[in-house]
Amino acid sequence: MGRASITYTNKDYDSLRRELLARVPQLTDRWTDFNASDLGVVLLELFCGIGDMLAYYLDAQAAEAFLPTARQRQNVINLCKLISYRLDGPVAATTALRFSLAAPLEADLVIPAGTTCRARLEENDIVFETAEDATIPRTRTSVDAGARQGKRKTETFTAEGETSDPIILAGKEIAHGSIRVWVQDQEWTEVSHFQESGSDSRHFMAETDALDITRIVFGDGLRGALPDTGAEIRVEYLETLGAEGNLGPNLVTELLSAIYLDGGLVPLAVTNPVPATGGADRETLEHARRQAPAEVRSLWKAVTKEDYLALAEGFPGVAKAQVLDVNDCKNIRYYQVNLAVAPDGGGPPSTLLKQDLAEYLESRKVITVEINLFDPVYRPVSIDAEVFAYAGEDLDLVRSRIEQALADFFAFDRMIFGAPVHYSDLVALLDGVRGVSHVRMYTPTQDIDIRAGQIAALGQVNLDVRRAS
């Protein structure tokens, strides 16, 4: 007996519809109208749609059970949760705000944490708030303070005791790590799990699902304390723009909070002398698939170079990093680890980001190791070329295509630390642009070596576009 042939491609909508319509004459001879307007055909097509959807989910069930193949965000979140990895939400951009006086005051002026400032742009307004207190001494006229992008929001709830459900927050773009919870004016601590929580541990968890809905979860009274019935719960968080919060220097110019000294309002000027960097949208599934196994291999402890790299690149706000030790440079001492850190969106990392990352790594490193964080060096690569276009091509359009191709080639997301720029790749890139006949490259003339701690970036572009003879 021959082996039965099973068709695995007849479970979609069209295949189900054809098969069901073909079976109708076998069941009855009274149904002869198969127009799309027929009520029976409408019902049949509805069942075909449901069957198509069920078949898809059944086929995808096996793929959704494994992290490398899962495509639905909620399934990736659940799989990562099994290995104690949590996908990052939006990350607030950080910068330094400089507060300036017209003349020194007779006393020290304290600018409290939470002072808000604004950058007015054509698209929208971007608000920053200081992350720490800053003081202008009476002999000086300015001070710099670290700041994060976002608007502070507060919500109040009432605890319902043992029957209470998780608290659902209204904010959808909550900055990663910005949630703070008070129960009866007593602050509780956020944890990633309740495994090490006791019955009196004032701990809570913040969980965000695939729809960006954030829930505050308390313990059950055994693993983590449970708020008393009727207790007031106050939740405070920062709502951020993510990657849109990255902006250039000297754009934050408005002070929204009032600053007083001895009851009098003090006029202050504000600006950001350095760019705002490190802002990022919620973590992508591709990044989670790559980062979660790397952090599991490190066991969240920094011992090897791979451990430091995994922990640094998994830190919110860090796009890429490079780890250097004594094996890479003779000037580096034993038991010293140097990290070049590039923030999300490119540019230099802010002082606030480096402080947070240093504290994070300090708690996970070997006690004898010294960690040094430094800014990346963006190595400009200038392009000087003579480009010959086919007859009939618009020369300005060809030029814009080449400029766009170069911008895409040197995009920050594509470049990695220490990766050389090959001459042949640049020639092939320009020669492959639509409308280009051939290219004569003057600069560069050979491969460009990029040293450790450096990232290639597009420099000056000089293109002589002419028609091919």
What are these language model-derived features?
Residues 1-469:
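Signature of Asx- and small-polar-rich beta-strand/turn repeats characteristic
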